[in-house]
Amino acid sequence: MSAIYDKGTDCVYISAKELAEFISRGGDIGAKDSRGNKNGKTIVSHKLWQKKPNILDSYAFTTISEGTKITVFSYPECLHKMEKGYSIDYIYTVDYSLDIIDNGQLEVALKTAVCAGYIMCERLGLTEIEANVSFYREGSDEAREFKQVISYEDLKGNFELMIALFSPFAKIIKDKGSNVTEQLSSLRFPFEGGPREGQRDFIIDTFRAIKSRKRLVVQAPTGIGKTMASLYPALKSIGCGDADKVFYFTGKTTTALSALNAIDIMRNQIPDLRSIHISSKDKCCVSFKPGDRRRCEPKYCHRTKSYFDKINVALLDLLENYRTYTKEIIDEIAQRYEVCSYELSLELSEWCELVVCDYNYLFDLNAYLRRYFEIMPEADFIFLFDESHNLPDRAREMYSVTLQKSDFEGIKNKYPQIDEFTVACQGILSEFDTYYQLAMSEKMEINDTLCGFYINSQLSDDFILPYLDMIEACKKVFRKSLDDDEVNEIYLNLKKLRSVCEIYDKRFTTYIEAVGDEVKLRIMCLDPSFMLDACMKKGICSILFSATLTPLEYFSDVLGCEKSNTLSLKSPFPPENQCLICISNVSTRFDDRDKSATNIANIIRAMIAGKSGNYIVYFPSYSYLMQVMEIFKEKYPKIPVTAQSRSMSEKAKKEFLDSFDEKKEGTLVGFCVMGGSFSEGIDLRGERLIGAMIVGVGLPTISTELNIVKEYFDKTRENGYAYTYTYPGMNKVLQAAGRVIRSENERGVVLLVDDRFASPEYKMIIPEYWSHMKYLTNARDLLDTVTKFWKK
């Protein structure tokens, strides 16, 4: 909502269009966007009101409702002098069929004209006015017009009713503009003694980045207090008038909740600040079951029925009674009023100073929040990116898309009654036949199966045409109310393909793979940094931070922040609390794993012999994990072990973590995969984990696709192997090592096992806070070192 409060005039300002749309909306959720539903694009002929409108008094009307001063204004270009009297004209251009304009849309359009008409009548002393509303379809001559002469009395009655309904929201806007701003401007750092070492530098540099409207990339080791160090200056900047809203982006629910917890710590200073965590649509939907298609229509979900009739009541309940909006609170209110929890959270976010959500709500081509990053291009947003080491890989996948021949073979005969659908399927299958021939120009035989591949960085102008035909054919299926999960999944993938093709350039490539009769087409984004850069430009400042951004220059580059300021902080924990050792004479390369497995088992035994407690050993692959664990169990049968399995339910993951109990006597050795669920994002504090051993340098598994990425970076950065394998691998090592020592009073052992860690290449990228690492070559010296450490 674009209504604002001006402290100087002690008044809430809102346009006639905004007021009418907010108060008069009604009907169901039935959003199928480009499939032909009413929720397509709408462009009003006059300019949209921006943050500080230049309001002519002759076209504005001020009233006081329940103690709140409200000014509603309209645009001069809407008023026209006729031969007899005046008309108020609103022209809408839409991108969908005018046949599906319903009473709800017409009601909002007419109420907009009514609201503006009343203002004109008041200022010009008119007894009536003609309200004209016209709809035109973009790119065609199709038009629908609605005309109505309305008396002053009717205009006044409608206007006063809208003001009465808007009044409680106006009070909230006033409180937000006065109380919240004042609270944030005087916000103090919430902990006694002020920021800790390193945290202060983080805060100062964040303030500077916001003031100068630049980006900052921060490597802040565990214990710095990254969440508070980023949130505190960002929120205070709202109070200082430097920003409107803060977005805290993260890829994990645990870090999202940490942001809300930080607000709770400051809550006594900012009681009126509103913060929200937007969960994914799948997690919010009460009708969705994994494996099914989500159907956001009254026929399938009762919470979409009359959603827009009920939304304001639900919204007001939340705004008046809560300030921190978790998924649980939003779900409770959504259930009370029988409305969609996800849509309610999006609506509610517009009233919040802090929005916590996933990366894809900014970066994903089909999931980004259009209400902020398309409709409000001039708003002053601050972006905070937690765990930003995950962003390059997430983004690369967001801008890549895969199609398979078998998907279209499975649906080609489904709807013989829809000729366009059958023809479109056949057209795409013909394309896949061509892809097959291209792939087989580089054919080989693997396990008695004929395989081939083809790579081309160019994309012809007509490449997308058969897929666009298929998109239109899918729409015909949906228009006939034929519900088909399989077709819907293909349709969504084709929409993604269309979006990716629109940004396809030299940073993409087309990869075709044929295995037997199956053909896979993959449009690969090799370097998403340009898209990350473009999306971050939608905010005034971006702060990207993580405990593991090594090397910092590499991450600044792949995050689209090549020219940004950087900050690398030291660990706040005493180095003497960490026994950091590298066994530098063991090779864990794939070809050497059979020879090194027994040695690894003996090294584990030496590491844990110094002190009883809980340990985790991280391996580069599951097969290597199982190989070493079996040897370890055979050699040391009395030592309890637990292992990560290939696929674990949430319940199984919790049980695995619960086994690391600090009150349990004896020793437990956990066997996990590096880069998996238990090497990042878990917080085993105190005695729950006193040691971690990292086997190998974390290199991603070599693949054709990664080698394509490597070749790209060889050409563009002259360092393809490091960009594709070395640096991402080292990041996994640092993340796994970071599971040990989570607070300043903890002590623990971190052991790296691989001869490559002692090479100049790796010594150059080992972070400064690991400068105290000892290099050993045998289990006996390891045992002596850890024993002495624990005796200190």
Positions of PLM-derived features:
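Walker A/P-loop
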Residues: 211-233
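Metal-dependent nuclease catalytic cores that hydrolyze phosphodiester bonds in DNA/RNA
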Residues: 1-85
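Conserved RecA-like P-loop NTPase helicase motor core
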Residues: 584-595, 645-758
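Nucleic-acid nuclease catalytic cores
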Residues: 64-156, 751, 757-758
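A contiguous, basic/glycine-rich beta-loop/short-helix subdomain that forms a polymer-engagement track
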Residues: 330-350, 355, 366-373, 473-587, ...
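Signature of the SF2 helicase/ATPase Hel1-core->accessory helical subdomain module
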Residues: 230, 257, 261, 337-354, ...
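Conserved pre-motif I regulatory segment
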Residues: 176-219
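A substrate-engagement module of RecA-like helicase motors
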Residues: 177, 181-185, 242-355, 363, ...
